[in-house]
Structures are given as C-alpha cells and as structure tokens.
Amino acid sequence: MPPLTAPLTACIALVSLAIAFGQKAPAAKPAPLVKILNRFTSPGVPVLGPAESDVTPRKWDKPAPSGLPGNGMAQHPMLYIGEGYNKMLLVNNGKVAWTYSTGSGFEYDDVWMLSNGNVLFTRMQYVAEVTPEKKVVWRYDAPAGTEIHTCQPIGLDKVMFVQNGLPPKLFVVNIKTKAVEVEHDLPAPSLTDKATIHAQFRRTRYTAQGTYLVSFLEMGKVVEYDKNFREIWSYEIPTPWAAVRLKNGNTLITDEKDILTREVNRKKETVWELRPGDLPEPYRYINTQSATRLANGNTVVCSRGTEGKTPQLVEVTPDKRVVWVLQDWANLGPATAVQILDDPGIPERPGDSQH
C-alpha cells in the first residue's frame, strides 16, 4: 500500500478529531430523509389540508437571544412538535417549510417521518399517518375515555402504539390490511380510577431486538418486554417520560420530574447523565420530556420551556459541551419531541432512529 499523502492524512485527522468531540464527521452519503424534503414544498401541497383544523395563533413573540451556540433554526432540518401548540412544524434551511395543524384540544406527543415521506404522529385523541400533500392514509381514533401519546412505525405497513385506558393496551396494527396483529393489556396503577389514565404512558419503543421498551410515567419505571410480554429488564426512575434503546445497547431515559436525561447500561449503571445544572445558566431548560441521541454521539434534549423564557432544544456532546441552543419562540412553540432529519438511518427500521 502506498504511503498516505499529507492532505489525506490531514483529512483523516480532522475526521477523528470531529468524532472525538462529538461533532459530525463528513457523511459518506446524504441522510435518506433529506432527499425527500422537497416534496413538502411542492406546488401541490395545500396550506391547510382537508383534515386539518387551524390553531389559535401562538402567544409567544419574544425574539431569539443573540449569541446562542449553533445556527438557530438552520442547525438541523427537523420535525418539531410540542404540547400546548397543535401545529406540527417541518423546519428546513432555517425556516418553517411545512406545517400540519390539528385544532384545539390536547396534544402532540410523538412524531415520525418515514422514508416514503409520510408522517406518523399521535394527537392524544388519535394516531394518524399523512402524506407530504396532507392526505390522511391511515387514522385510528382513541375510544372514549382513552388516550394515545406514543407510536412507532414498524416497516411501512405496521404501526405500534399504546392506548392509555382501563386497562391500557399496546397495539401493533397492519395499516394496509387493517389487521390487529398485537393487542396486549399493560399494567397500570389502577384499573378503575379514570383520573389515572392521562399519566399512564408517554413513550414506548419497539427495539431492533424485537422487544418492547415501555416507560411507565406514573408507576416510576421503564420495563422491557420480550415478544411474549415477559419482563426481561427494568429500571426504576421517578417519572420516566421517554426511553429509547441505543445502538450501543444502553438505554437513554428522560425523567420529567427531575429534569434529567440519563443513559444506563444493562447492569442499570449510569454511564452518562445531563441535568440543567451541568450547563451554563443561559442554556438551562425546564420541563424536559424527550431526548434524541444522534449518530455522531451528541444528544438533543427537548423542553416545553417557559413560554419564551428558556431554550426549547439543547444539543450537547458526550462531554456536555453545548454546540446548539434553540430558543426561538417567535417561530416555534414548546418542544415535546423532535426528529432530526439529517441523521442517517431508515426511521421505520426499528433501532435506526434513536428518538
């Protein structure tokens, strides 16, 4: 093998340095979702689709503070949703490029863009999949007295979701054949008290190993079940809003009450943790609900914020260096969940998207 040239050696060194500091190394190929974003701004996309309902204008108008790390709304293309503002936002090239409004009521909690461009989301009263042109291709309405806060695509033809209720149930539905392939009752703090329904669950994920990772928000634990719903792993934490199985085998958990994001291993040892107090004061957030682990090792934390007073998104490196703070209440509402669209992977392939 001939010796490396100086420019190539320098390039390799820069890539290694970028990886070491949790920054993006040059990608070998574009992320698949980036290639389809032009569909959302094509001439055939209506401002308000036939199934949409307009929302009350946002009440936050404070401009973004100057000098925040990163590139504001231009840092990443992303799908962005938040409790308290029923308008889903697709951000691309630093601006809102597409929206999906769902009227009054509660609440956006989970969102996925699929590799075919469709968007799967929960809206508490229902779970639905829409095209970039805002055509509804599938929808399931929660029965009276139940709620849906979490969903996940499994391939392009199946959807997993949890229905809070008495009892709560986990479903896997084939949206093409309409067949219910899985319907399983989940534990709950009460099977008779309607007041406990809302706080039962916010996040459940189907893993690359074919298991179900369930966050019991009110019961204070994250439980992993095998395909037959036998418990194979659990972790106690006061109010787990979300948990995602990482590609390294660890589990990334966000706790709403303690405002923390914690990575634990199979032995239940904490290997990484982030709290607002770990950050410089101007970058501190409150009301954290979900978090995303990017392919470069960075973590993006979502916050409902304080109506314009604190950041909505914060991205940190593994050593907790802040590389991006998004505080833009003039254009965006609270951040409950975000899907970073320039991250590699096929979202509907379990385990590819760590959000």
Regions found by a protein language model. Name each.
Residues 7-20:
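Bacterial N-terminal signal peptides
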Residues 24-355:
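Histidine-/acidic-rich catalytic cores in large beta-rich domains
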Residues 1-4:
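N-terminal secretory signal peptides that target proteins for export/translocation
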